Regions:
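Structured C-terminal helix/loop/strand segments within mature extracytoplasmic catalytic/sensor domains
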Residues: 1-113
Length: 116
């Protein structure tokens, strides 16, 4: 909003790497595969996730799984990531849903298909 940078790019990169590899405790690999963005959970039921260059999201629901991560928070984050096309690992074919393209944020130019 203000454009004020509060951490250096190197610190941000380090924090996102740690979030991606360990932020969801022993299920971090599954989280990264399913949701596709670095995330950090807390044992109170909160989850913070970051899609670099796109934005962040937060969830809260106190029902936890065996790893200590919010069950509903994971479901919500996965749904939002897929709907909004936030995953770092999504192929070009996995674009945001049409309803998400009308939401806030920068608009992507639409590609026109070539017909022969």
């Amino acid at each position: 909003m203000t454009g004020l940078r509060v951490v250096t790019p190197a610190v941000c990169q380090h924090a996102l790497a740690v979030m991606g590899t360990a932020g969801m405790y022993e299920t971090s690999g599954d989280w990264l595969f399913d949701v596709g963005v670095p995330g950090k959970s807390g044992i109170a039921g909160g989850i913070v996730a970051v899609s670099p260059g796109k934005g962040g999201l937060g969830t809260f629901s106190p029902l936890l799984d065996r790893a200590g991560n919010s069950v509903r928070g994971q479901l919500a984050a996965r749904h939002l990531s897929r709907t909004l096309g936030l995953s770092l690992f999504a192929s070009r074919e996995q674009r945001p849903s049409p309803s998400a393209q009308n939401g806030p944020g920068p608009r992507r130019p639409q590609r026109k298909s070539l017909s022969m």
